[in-house]
Amino acid sequence: MILSDKTILKMLAEKTLIIEPLEKEQIQPASVDIRLGNTFSIVEDSCTGIINLEKEVKYKTITSDTYILLPNQFVLATTMEYFELPNNLTAFVEGRSSLGRLGLFIQNAGWVDPGFKGEITLELFNANRCAIELKAGRRVGQLVFAKMDDTALNPYKGKYQGQKGATGSRVFLDYEVK
């Protein structure tokens, strides 16, 4: 069941859902607007030009209130907000249609697990022929919350728990199911 603004406000007041900082204008009928933070990360150039998924990838991190996203460029960014989801709530990240119509895509996994704590890393791609100026504080998407039928048996405790800033891939820490 997708949560209404009324339920979101109730959970925030009870502190069973934490979103900080949060302005009341961010709360929509069935979602919460998320804003762009001021941390951006790009993959550092590799001498081979190949990313090996078994090894840690190095990132260049930039802290700035403005970032110029070039045409066909990919950058990691972060939300301004920090989240703490209870163990019976999950969330979906959706990009804003108004920005998508300009060629700015939020290409993230789109899923926030129950029990997650941290800022959400956003994967941004500029599909436009023109550069796009990104500014910290701008609304870039929505978080849609869904209540689960029961509390998660194993809430999120993964490799991105507690992340702050534009956090690079930690795929090299994965173990594959055989």
Curated annotation (Swiss-Prot):
InterPro entries: dCTP_deaminase (IPR011962), dUTPase-like_sf (IPR036157), dUTPase_trimeric (IPR033704). It holds the Pfam family DCD. One of its GO terms (biological process) is dUTP biosynthetic process. GO terms for molecular function: dCTP deaminase (dUMP-forming) activity; dCTP deaminase activity; nucleotide binding. Pathway: Pyrimidine metabolism; dUMP biosynthesis; dUMP from dCTP: step 1/1. Bifunctional enzyme that catalyzes both the deamination of dCTP to dUTP and the hydrolysis of dUTP to dUMP without releasing the toxic dUTP intermediate. This is dCTP deaminase, dUMP-forming. It comes from Acetivibrio thermocellus (strain ATCC 27405 / DSM 1237 / JCM 9322 / NBRC 103400 / NCIMB 10682 / NRRL B-4536 / VPI 7372) (Clostridium thermocellum).
